[in-house]
Amino acid sequence: MGDIRQSLLPRDVLSAAKELLYHLDIYISNLVQSGRQPPQVDTKTLELVEEFILHAPKDRNALTRRMSALQELQLLEIMCSCFQEQSRDNVRQLMFSALFSLQGNQADDSRMALLGKLVSMAVAVSRVPILECAANWLQRTHCVYCVRLAQVLVDDYCSMMPGSVPTLQNIHSASPRFCCQFITAVTTLYDLTSEELTPPLELLQMIVSWIQEDPRLVLVTFLNTPLSGSPPSTSLDVTPLGGLVRWCVKAPLVYKRDKKQMLPHSSSGSEQEVAALFSALHLSVLQVFMLLPNILNEKGIFGRLALLQVESLASLTSDLSRLLDQADKHTHTPAADVHVHPQLALDRLAQALQVAMANGALLCSREDLRAICSRLPHNNFWDIFLRRLLQEGSDGT
């Protein structure tokens, strides 16, 4: 495709981008039809994408071509139509990869900006092919960039235009694969370490309703992922279970750190409403764990593949220990709440560990479990639970 550059240069920015998309579709269709395995887009084509769609200058002395806001909107509409009209999924996926796979160069910022706008538009107009392509992108891209994409959607649909939350909620039925990856990304983004990293109430309500309606939703990526090898450590987790457990365990303490910051992202809602949402979420997560034995046995991997990682739990217990120390120092906490919220956090962690281990989601030796739990302060209930769990696991380790 390198020979079409000269024909694109005289065109205006929108016309050039549209023409390149047309040729890119033909080029990739022919590439797939040739049967070459794996089909790979050549470097010159990627450079054309960067120059005429992402508008990264080919060299330092070249003038940077820019689109107006209207032209950019028109380009997004053209891209939506292009993916919608292409009937072959493998062509769509390869085309999406040519446009948005990160290359480790200066064009990546433009790539991410355009991707965020395209996916946000796809959510708004329910362009399922783009959401499916974005689900694959989220599965193979470094989690730092996945979180950036999730942040765009939360900002667009939960912050800047709260009334449009129902539009985002529809991704559950439009593309369960994308919805599952989105949940994993937002639980990675909002780790409850600060006010800014506490999920907005609207987002929390949406995720709870999704999982209550369909607990298997959080397993969609796992169920559709080949078991040929482990994903890179820099990728998102294969399920959002670790992030959801983190939310449920830390929530009683995080939302009590400062009553003035009870609902940092929302103008409505109450302490009781938030508590009820996290309680419902915790129950749903336990129900997901209880679905796993049949699923893992069907795949022949029960006891061989952990969906809840020991490293993630170690990080959680470290955070929880810090939060418990902070809770002890809060002088304005009502006396009745001094032990209630720490106890609730510990109870949820104990329940999650127990149910996860019993149902094959967590593969953990007694030594690992003891090391994880040693970070936590002494607590009668926790000590009893730990002794029982270690005793139950003694025959299998």
How would you name each of these model-derived features?
Residues I53, L291, H330, A352-N359, ...:
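Hydrophobic alpha-helical segments
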Residues L21, L118, L346, L369, ...:
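Generic L/I/V-rich hydrophobic alpha-helical segments across diverse proteins
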Residues M357-T397:
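Eukaryotic acidic, Ser/Thr-rich intrinsically disordered low-complexity regions
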Residues T141, R148-G163, T167-A352:
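Long alpha-helical repeat scaffolds
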Residues P38, A62, F278, G303-A306, ...:
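Polar low-complexity intrinsically disordered regions enriched in Ser/Thr and small residues
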Residues M1-S228, P232-S235, L244, L353, ...:
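Extended hydrophobic, helix-prone interaction segments
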